Amino acid sequence: MSTIYEIPCVKGFIRMCNDGWLQGWHERNGGNLTYRMTGEDVAACRPYFDAEPREWVNMGVQADNLAGEYFITTGSGKFFRNVEPDPIHSIGIVEINDKGDSWRIVWGLADGARPTSEFPSHFMNHSVRKAATNGANRVIYHCHATNVIALTYILPLTDRDFSRALWQSATECPVVFPEGVGVCPWMVPGGADIAMATSEKMKTYQAAIWAQHGLFASGPDFDITFGLAHTIEKSAEIYVKVLSMGGGLIRQTITDDDLRAIAHDFGVTLNKNFLD
């Protein structure tokens, strides 16, 4: 590889940032993305690391199962629209110390930039999802998905109500996220409260919705994670359009028996708490 940008994990990270920007989910500096690197990723990127790593910064959170890991992360205050044309200032790689409570920049985030302000929240959720998936989960993605946010103004803010609405709005949804989605009430972004609330939801779900704020999605790779967010947002868009066209009247929908039939044929297990 002649540049770090040709390494698959970095190339995929940049592409996902641009995909989200093209969807319209990342106005200004909205949203953030982190990826937990494999050993092979780190080995491939190491020749491009800074000659001298920057100082350690305590996160205020701690996770034993992430000690010594490396993450690619978007930068605080950085715009997703600038990731592709200017990655060196927009994204970076951070190393976690052996106590699992501090990071230091080893590449990128040039000229004094820092990891996303939501990094502690991402970090806690990486810890939860790594444990829940036996290490398979590697991506945490937060975006301002327009129709998902719109639904948080009209639907009851419960896991059940949102999961059913999304499942019944697009046939693929019960296959893509059979466990449903979690919902968190409005909280101040970037704080410990929203990090804790989200990590509790992510023990059960691949995705959590932040009321009046956006979507938090996870997965084993960039394609699966972006696909999850895209599927949830498209289903929300369908539901918004149905409500708008019919004045709130829904004449027919995917029934609970239909959902069970989908689960049977596709070999997935639906969250029974969300079925009538």
Name what the model sees in each region.
Residues 1-276:
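Glycine-rich flexible loops
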